Amino acid sequence: MSVSAVGSFWLSPSPGKLPRPRMVVRSSAVSVAPILTHLQKQCATPLPVLRHVADAMAADMRAGLAVDGGSDLKMILSYVDTFPTGNEKGLFYALDLGGTNFRVLRVQLGGKDERVIATEFEQVTIPQELMFGTSEELFDFIACGLANFAKKEGGKFHLPSGRKREIGFTFSFPVKQTSIDSGILMKWTKGFAVSGTAGRDVVACLNEAMERQGLDMQVSALVNDTVGTLAGARYWDDDVMVAVILGTGTNACYVERTDVIPKLQGQMSSSGRTIISTEWGAFSNGLPLTEFDRDMDAASINPGEQIFEKTISGMYLGEIVRRVLLKMAEAGALFGEYVSEKLSTPFILRTPDICAMQQDNSDHLDAVGAILYDVTGVKSDLSVRKMVVEVCDTIVKRGGRLAGAGIVGILQKMEEDSKDLIFGKRTVVAMDGGLYENYPQYRRYLKEAVTELLGLEMSKNVVIEHSKDGSGIGAALLAASNSKY
């Protein structure tokens, strides 16, 4: 998944054209308090639930490493086995394609003493028609953007003589990686329907387009954004072992020993380690789900899939809250005699909206009232607003705590194979994504769950650090550490 797709929860599915406000009469007058109480009970994540989730995550990881298709978790091999050391020197580029924009970036590296001397980046919006065009059209457009960006190179940026410019390519769509610099596109997602790419090597597609543009560059590393985040954070801190993206969608990757990956079948890396992309959004074992989750899943474009993602990531939290409020409005007259048509519109309430409501500290919760009115067309008094905030908190608390349990599951799996190498010393988890960055309550619940599961002493060794937009630099660094030179 990508920074633009996963890493920012400010993107949300367009709900389409809103219907004209029409009033529908509520069905019955039941008090809403029991609905909230029942919701809180179903969403509860006491320690035994968290422990089950962490253990199941570790077990699913093992099964996914044993054989392809062994569990819900794909456990994709990244082929990254040389990590940035800090000694890298020279000029490297990164290209990040993961949503409706792509980013191009250049970085001048100065080795151990100077590290990152300078960086520059640009963002380019992909025209809607190219998302439904041919492979050549899309990649020609990207190569053209890259060529225009490369033309502006100057100042502190200079390529050592006799070298070709090298790129780290962050491509955040489902890819079956075949080496550090090649991967077959399995299918387009996120609203893309480009013809002629599925089943092809995406690096070859880009290389051919660069040739057509007369651009003398080559891809040295193909990565997803989670792997890029890990590499970018590890460049500054050798203790980084895990990277997690929590934004519109979610994923996690970590550093694994190659001798504990049965499906590698004896292929060893020079360092004895590699990065595994867990694709943990597909995890589903033992999660506390409600009727609202089941209904939302059934109505989604991928029913029965990505259940963990649908419980913890930014694309879905607002929608779950909306579904709860709709039931409260219909069954318990939460917003009066009528239910606004807007409240019945899927995805009209976004995670940034529920985040903003939870930040309201005013006496009358004026911001909550304004958001409810502006976004869902309902009027509310103070007691109603308090209940709405409780609903938001219930859904966000569950999401944050389950994400924390997932992180502990990854650490547990690593610890089982390398006694005291994880919990016995400082271990850093690099976090990126708009949900983690912008939602303080979510962040707090995540960290509390990690502490509860590990205990106060052991959890002191686990450092959760925000690594903002690390995946672009990370991709350039992986191009450098896997450089042909």
Q: Where in the sequence are the language-model features?
A:
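Gly/Ser/Thr-rich active-site cleft segment
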Residues: 160-218, 224, 237-238, 248, ...
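Short, internal active-site loops enriched in acidic
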Residues: 172-177, 226-229, 433-437, 469-471
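Short beta-strand scaffold segments in enzyme catalytic cores
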Residues: 102-107, 228-232, 243-244, 250-256
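ATP-binding/phosphotransfer module of carbohydrate and carboxylate kinases, centering on a glycine-rich
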Residues: 2-165, 236, 293-485
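Short, glycine-/Ser/Thr-/acidic-enriched flexible segments
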Residues: 249, 259, 283, 322, ...
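Short glycine-aspartate micro-motif
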Residues: 92-96, 164-168, 221, 241-245, ...
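Generic beta-strand/beta-sheet core signal
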Residues: 170, 223, 255, 432-434, ...
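Glycine-rich phosphate-binding loop and adjoining helix at the ATP-binding site
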Residues: 123-143, 147, 175-234, 238-242, ...
